[in-house]
Design a protein with these regions (language model features):
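A residue-level marker of the well-folded mature domains of exported/periplasmic proteins
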Residues: 8-356
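C-terminal motif of bacterial Sec signal peptides marking the signal peptidase cleavage site
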Residues: 3-7
Length: 356
């Protein structure tokens, strides 16, 4: 979105809300917020940003989301319900970049502006999404790969047999997870091949199909195995992680969001194989934060993780809707992400993004 300017009419129809009060300013604006789920503290952090900004601006917000991020049909219904409320705007974190297209067309037809946050909807009907506020997920996935590779590159260089790197992605439907997963895969493949080794990506077909010049599984020096659980839960993510972590040739594994990273840690409770170096076990890297991940990074169970800025994303989504309704220009915003480990997680630019 290069930049859009419009305005919203005040729609004060007496709806009950649980956001900021409709005090001075804000033109009586009411916004609906549809998140991916409330199952992880990531989304609780994002809602903190929503609520704080709503109170600051004097607008009201109503927040909904399905029980799990794999509950795509439930979220689509919640989005349709939000549209039917005829709000001044909607902030949406879509679980599926395809399943919401019809609803976005309906919102466009009703002239309800939509801001996507956390994840975009690349094929949204033109004009339906006024701005996207999200991490550059491909770049963030690449950061995870770069930091992992520094630890495992000597093992790969000196290996006489095939070695394996695992990646657990919670889905193959949302733009942020797929972008992040491919960012990791492409960067890891690039780094390995630059050092003269061959790579084959195997596992979940969606991710395999995105790989350019994929190698041969039988002869590749390095296998990158990608797994996606049947549903978005820590337990099922743990099962997928265990399947990779029990293979003798596995030297590293990446959980690409809070749920899957916690799945890796849950698997490790039974296996006790995560270590700081591939000589001592399997090198683990996570994504996002939360108390479980923070503790694992602090004690060295994971060598590190990449955190986003969910509070900022929630806040900026409400600000963008407000600005649009006020007739101001709105643009896409790429929010920050940071690599953190036991050494830097207390630093001023890192610590505020490490939510519990």
């Amino acid at each position: 979105v290069a930049g859009l300017v419009a305005g919203c009419g005040s729609k004060d129809d007496g709806k009950a809300t649980d956001g900021g009060d409709s005090g001075e300013g804000g033109g009586g604006y009411h916004f609906e917020v549809v998140v991916k789920s409330f199952q992880s503290t990531y989304w609780q952090a994002a809602i903190t940003g929503v609520d704080t900004k709503a109170e600051e601006l004097g607008v009201t917000v109503n927040k909904t989301g399905p029980n799990a991020e794999s509950d795509i049909a439930d979220q689509v219904q919640q989005l349709n319900n939000a549209i039917n409320q005829n709000p001044d705007g909607i902030a949406l974190a879509a679980n599926s970049q395809d399943a919401v297209l019809e609803a976005l067309q309906t919102a466009l037809d009703k002239e309800i502006p939509v801001v996507c946050f956390d994840t975009g909807v690349p094929n949204a009907p033109e004009g339906s999404v006024i701005a996207t506020i999200a991490t550059d997920n491909e770049a963030a996935g690449a950061v995870a790969a770069e930091n992992m590779y520094e630890v495992i590159k000597d093992t790969i260089a000196n290996a006489t047999d095939q070695v394996r790197i695992g990646e657990v992605n919670q889905d193959a439907t949302s733009a942020n997870i797929s972008g992040r997963g491919m960012g990791f895969i492409n960067k890891m493949k690039e780094l390995i091949e630059a050092d003269g080794k061959t790579v084959a990506v195997v596992g979940n077909q969606y991710y395999v199909d995105q790989v350019e010049n994929n190698g041969d599984e039988a002869s590749a020096d390095v296998i990158i195995e990608v797994a996606v659980p049947a549903q978005t839960t820590v337990e099922l993510s743990s099962t997928e992680a265990s399947n990779i972590m029990t293979k003798e040739d596995t030297i590293a594994i990446f959980g690409s969001n809070q749920v899957t990273a916690e799945g890796v840690l849950t698997a490790n409770q039974n296996l006790s194989v995560l270590a700081a170096t591939p000589e001592d076990g399997i090198v683990g890297v996570g994504f996002d934060a939360g108390a479980t991940l923070k503790a694992a990074v602090a004690d060295g169970t994971l060598i590190g993780a990449v955190t986003q800025a969910p509070v900022d994303q929630g806040s900026l989504a409400i600000q963008a809707l407000y600005d649009y309704c006020e007739g101001k220009e709105v643009k896409d915003i790429a929010t920050d992400s940071y690599w953190y480990d036991a050494e830097n997680m207390e630093e001023d630019d890192i610590a505020p993004n490490l939510y519990d």
